[in-house]
Structures are given as structure tokens and as C-alpha cells.
Amino acid sequence: MTTPAPARPTERPIPSPFTGAGKLWRATFLSHILNPWNMAFALLLPMFMYAMFGMTDVARATQTGRGNLAAAMIAMMTTYGVILVGGSLGATLSVERTTGISRMYALTPIQPWVILLVRLTALVALSAFITLITFSFGMATGAQMTAGAWAASAAVVIALSALGALIGLACGYTIKGENAYSASAFVMLMGAFVSGMFIPLDQLPPFVAQIAPFTPLYGAVQAIYAVAGTVTMPTAAWLNIAGWAVVTAGIAWWGASHDTDR
């Protein structure tokens, strides 16, 4: 009588942490670009604001260091659009937490850092898409800058979308449900007004100029002014960007750790 040999455990290759990353990237990109409300605020609103203030003879005739004022305006409005997209993408995490999607990710091979990388690359693609359309609209309607200034402005605008994503992440990890979208949009709208994104600070009440350097979007506004050649980038603007990036990233990290422990 022979004794059957014990069955060997099935050897399966360890799946790649990038398994499903491509599908997640496409889903993330399409869910935002095909959302009419997202595109209305991120694309149509900046062009409408530019049309109101930038498509004037004064804006076309006023020269900055690297172009005209109309070009600086389209770059500024585009920045607001991509920051809104970044905030929306970051706040999406809140909805995923409340619906249980984030826990479903934990059952798949894809790693959390890969999910973050996918979201960031999708944000870059979305920001580049918005920037291409709005800058083309600006060029066709009298906005003028040197080729180098257009390229530098586009790079800065796309990079600043990460600030919106950090604000959205901070809201998404600390505020439950779809309220995170409202909170993120509120922070950005108020920040845009107080930082001089829509109306220059010298045309606002004096107290606004005093608190502006401490608001989330002040550094972004100054960065656009600097790349357009209207002003030099002040030290306070660099500190503003770095400080708010650290604060929002810290809040998001704390929220992510708390969510993982739970």
C-alpha cells in the first residue's frame, strides 16, 4: 500500500503593485474630464473670467516684462481652474472612504502609493489639457507672451495644480462624504479672492493685503505674476507655498493614518 504524497501548495507569482493602475488612471481621468460640472468650473469659468477682464484694449495694450496683461490674466484664470480640478480629485477620497471603495482597494494588489501616483499623473494630464485649451483661447484673442514665457507659465500652472490636490486631500481625509467637495471649493474660492487672484490686492481694502500672505493661494498668485514678468517672486510667496504644502500634506497624512488604523 502506497501513501499518497502530500499536495504541494500552488505557487503563484506575487502580483505587481501596479496591477490595475492603467484602468484606475483611465477611470480617474475620464470621470473628471467627462463630468460637465467639473469642466464648467475648471475650463469655462476661467475663460469667462478672462473674457470679462482680459479681452479689453487696455489689457492687450498694457505690457508686462514678458508679454501683455491679457496673457497674465489667462494664466491666472487657468491656475484657478487647475487648482479646482486638483481639489476635486483630492476630495474624491472622502467619497471613496464613505462608500467603502478605499477598503476594496486594500483587497487588490495595487498599493496605496501607486494609487496616489496614478491620481497625481491623472491630475497632470487634466491640468495640461485645461492649460492647452485656455492658453490657445488666450492666444486667439490677443494674449501675447514670448514662447519661453508661455512654456514657463504652462509649467508653473500645471505644477500649482498639486497645491489644489493637497487642499482637496486635506478636506477629503478630515470631512466626511460629499461635504469635502464643498469645503475644498470654499477654501479655494475665498483664497482666490483674498490672495488677489481675481482683483489685484492694491484695489482691495488695506486689511486684505495684510492677511493675503497667510492665505493658501497667495504664493500661487505671486508665482504667476513672476513668470508673466509683472513682479519678482517675493520671499513671502515662496514661504507661503512651502508652508501651505506642509500644512495640507500633514493634515492629509494624519487623516490617511487615522483611516488606515480604523
Stretches with model-predicted labels:
Residues 106, 110, 141, 175, ...:
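Short helix-loop-helix connector
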Residues 2-4, 13-24, 199-238:
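Short hydrophobic, aromatic-rich alpha-helical segments embedded in or entering the lipid bilayer
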Residues 112-189, 232-253:
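Alpha-helical transmembrane segments and their short interhelical loops
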Residues 31, 54-58, 139, 143, ...:
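Transmembrane helix-loop junction
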Residues 52-59, 174-214, 218:
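Transmembrane helix segments
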Residues 13-20, 24-99, 127, 143, ...:
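Transmembrane helix-boundary elements of multi-pass transport/secretion proteins
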Residues 36-37, 71, 113, 178, ...:
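Residues that define the loop-to-transmembrane-helix transition and helix capping
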Residues 92-124:
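Helix-loop-helix units of permease transmembrane domains in multi-pass membrane transporters
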